[in-house]
Regions:
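Transmembrane-helix exit/juxtamembrane "anchor" motif
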Residues: 20-33, 240-264
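Alpha-helical membrane segments in multi-pass integral membrane proteins
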Residues: 130-142, 153-177, 183-205
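Early transmembrane hairpin module of multi-pass membrane proteins
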Residues: 1-130, 136, 148-151
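Short, membrane-exposed interhelical loops at transmembrane-helix boundaries
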Residues: 209-229
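Hydrophobic alpha-helical transmembrane segments
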Residues: 15, 222-242
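Non-transmembrane, juxtamembrane loop and terminal tail segments
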Residues: 34-46, 254-294
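Eukaryote-biased feature marking scaffold/signaling PDZ-domain proteins and nuclear chromatin regulators
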Residues: 10, 57, 102, 132, ...
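C-terminal TM-helix exit segments that contain a strictly Trp-centered aromatic cap at the helix terminus
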Residues: 15, 67-75, 143, 197-208
C-alpha cells in the first residue's frame, strides 16, 4: 500500500466526499437549514423521499473502505502475516496493518452513518459525530507512528498531512457541542478537501513526480516547494468550496424559483368557549361598572 495507488485512491475518495459535503453544506446554508426534498409527482412522492433520505455518504464510505481493505489484503503475495516464523518472532508488515486498520475504521464509520439515518427510528447525529471523532483520533495516532521511519521530503509531506488531520479533529470535537453551526461545517468540509487533495499530491510527489526525477531529501529547495505546493492546495480547495457555494446559490435563485424557503407555520388560533369562571368574572366586572355609574 505504500505506493502511488495507496495514496491516490484514498485521497480521491476523501476529495470526492468533500465535494459531496460541500454541496450539502451549501444547500443547507442557502436554505437556512431547511430540509429539502426533490420535486416529484404525488404517487411517487413517498418513493422519492425514501431515495433522498438514503445515506449516500455512508454507502460511499462502506464501498470505498471495503474495496481498499480487500486491496490491502490481496496486494501481498504472502498474505497479511502478523508474526514471522523466525526465532525470535517479529511483527510483519507494520505499515500494511496500519493501512488495513484505517480502511476498516472507514468502513465502520460508513456503517454507523447508514444505520443512524436509515435503520434507527430517529437519526442520532450525536452518534455519527462521536464515532467520526473517535475514528479521526485513531487515524491521527496511526499517522504519527506511520511517519516515524520517514525522512526528508516524505517526512515533510506526512507532517503537513498530520497537521490537516489534527485541525480536522479539533473541528469535529467542537461539533459535538455545536453540530448545526455553519462555520464548523464549512471548516470540516474544507479540511476534508485538503486532506484528499494533499493525499493525492503526496502520491505524485513520492512515487510519480511530474518531472520524472525523484525529489531529493537533502535538497532544501525541494523541501521548500513541498510547503509551497501545500499552500497552493489551500487556495485551490478554498476556491472549490467558494465556487460550489456560488454555483449552488446562483442555481437556486435563477433556476429553482419554486423551492421557497419553508418558514414555520403559525399555529391556528381557536376561540375557546368561555368557562364558568370567565363568566363569573365578567358578571363581577359588570356589577362594579353599574355601582360606579350609580
Amino acid at each position: 500500500m505504500g505506493k502511488f495507488i495507496g495514496h491516490f485512491y484514498p485521497g480521491l475518495f476523501l476529495f470526492s466526499y468533500g465535494l459531496y459535503q460541500a454541496t450539502v453544506v451549501s444547500k443547507g446554508m442557502i436554505l437556512k437549514g431547511c430540509v429539502l426534498y426533490p420535486l416529484c409527482s404525488p404517487r411517487n412522492k413517498q418513493r422519492c423521499s425514501r431515495l433522498w433520505k438514503i445515506s449516500y455518504g455512508g454507502l460511499l464510505k462502506i464501498v470505498t473502505g471495503s474495496l481498499l481493505t480487500f486491496y490491502v489484503v490481496l496486494c501481498l503475495d504472502s498474505g497479511m502475516v502478523l508474526m514471522s516464523k523466525q526465532v525470535p518472532s517479529r511483527f510483519m508488515y507494520p505499515k500494511e496493518w496500519q493501512h488495513l486498520t484505517m480502511f476498516i475504521l472507514l468502513t465502520l464509520n460508513g456503517c454507523v452513518d447508514f444505520m443512524s439515518k436509515n435503520v434507527l427510528p430517529q437519526r442520532c447525529v450525536g452518534l455519527e459525530k462521536g464515532t467520526l471523532v473517535l475514528i479521526i483520533y485513531q487515524l491521527l495516532l496511526l499517522m504519527v507512528s506511520h511517519a516515524k521511519d520517514s525522512e526528508g521530503v516524505e517526512l515533510h509531506v506526512h507532517s503537513l498531512l498530520i497537521l490537516v488531520v489534527f485541525l480536522l479533529l479539533l473541528v469535529l470535537t467542537a461539533q459535538l457541542w455545536a453540530p448545526n453551526m455553519c462555520h464548523l461545517q464549512l471548516m470540516e468540509t474544507f479540511l476534508m478537501l485538503m486532506m484528499g487533495s494533499w493525499l493525492m499530491q503526496a502520491g505524485f510527489i513520492l512515487y510519480r513526480p511530474v518531472s520524472g526525477y525523484p525529489w531529493q531529501d537533502d535538497d532544501i529547495s525541494d523541501i521548500m516547494f513541498v510547503t509551497t505546493f501545500f499552500c497552493w492546495h489551500v487556495m485551490i480547495d478554498a476556491s472549490f468550496l467558494l465556487g460550489i457555494y456560488g454555483f449552488s446559490s446562483f442555481w437556486y435563485h435563477c433556476y429553482s424559483p419554486s423551492l421557497k424557503l419553508t418558514r414555520p407555520k403559525e399555529a391556528p388560533y381557536y376561540a375557546s368557549t368561555p368557562g364558568p369562571l370567565y363568566k363569573l368574572l365578567q358578571e363581577v366586572e359588570q356589577s362594579e361598572k353599574e355601582d360606579q355609574a350609580l
